[in-house]
């Protein structure tokens, strides 16, 4: 990019084949008005393609070049306008990157299907699903309501009541956590939400763990509610 000082020291070149005796036209040495900003702060630079009919000038106000007899280009050649165009392109690319990076793409969920089991009383249960745990959440509410009405107090179901196959006599009966005795009572004022069946058994209504700090194992205690 030629600077203003280098352009001022540049000597106009004489076209080839004209010889050294050809004088430079005097009209090119005058300061012409800029066709863009109409400023007179201009200067002659050189002849385009070594042709006297295409003198090239430079405007110090708008910092653009123009050639006499040629078309005015909108694309700036040198000057601060080129730097500003680079900044605008950088800003637009950064804005596009931020917009693309901020988009939230939905995650695809894979459905889980359980095989159909047998039908009990017109209700079809599925193996391995949540409905196999004592008939689902509605049956759990019915069972706790029945225990709170018939037993000494309501509470949570044990592992055996959920159909896990962990009956009495297994190691789940006695659990030691080494944290002393813990009892979780359940409110006995729960209301019956639905009609209960006759096959539901009554079991204790509290969780109780008792243990010592020096031993780790299973001791006697209630684990069902």
Swiss-Prot record:
Keyword hit for Transcription: yes
Gene Ontology MF, one: DNA-binding transcription factor activity
Localization annotation: Nucleus
Disulfide bonds: none
Region (Disordered): 1-27
GO biological process: regulation of DNA-templated transcription
One Gene Ontology cellular component: nucleus
Keyword Transcription: yes
Chain's role: Transcription factor that binds specifically to a 5'-AA[AG]G-3' consensus core sequence.
Entry protein name: Dof zinc finger protein DOF5.8
Species, as recorded: Arabidopsis thaliana (Mouse-ear cress)
């Amino acid at each position: 990019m030629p600077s203003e000082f280098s352009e001022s020291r540049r000597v106009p070149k004489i076209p080839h084949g004209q010889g050294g005796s050809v004088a430079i036209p005097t009209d090119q040495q005058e300061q012409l008005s800029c066709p863009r900003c109409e400023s007179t702060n201009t200067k002659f630079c050189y002849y385009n393609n070594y042709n006297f009919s295409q003198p090239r000038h430079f405007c110090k106000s708008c910092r653009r070049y123009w050639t006499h007899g040629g078309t005015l280009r909108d694309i700036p050649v040198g000057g601060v306008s080129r730097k500003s165009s680079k900044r605008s392109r950088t800003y637009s690319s950064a804005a596009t990157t931020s917009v693309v990076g901020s988009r939230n793409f939905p995650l695809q969920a894979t459905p889980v299907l359980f095989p159909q089991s047998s039908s009990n009383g017109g209700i079809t249960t599925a193996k391995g699903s949540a409905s196999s745990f004592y008939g689902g959440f509605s049956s759990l509410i019915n069972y706790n309501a029945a225990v709170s009405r018939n037993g000494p107090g309501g509470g949570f179901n044990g592992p055996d009541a959920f159909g896990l196959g962990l009956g009495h006599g297994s190691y789940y009966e006695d659990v030691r956590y080494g944290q002393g005795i813990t009892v979780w009572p359940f409110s006995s004022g729960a209301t019956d939400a639905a009609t209960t069946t006759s096959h539901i058994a009554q079991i204790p209504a509290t969780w109780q763990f008792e243990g010592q700090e020096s031993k780790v194992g299973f001791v006697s205690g209630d684990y069902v509610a």
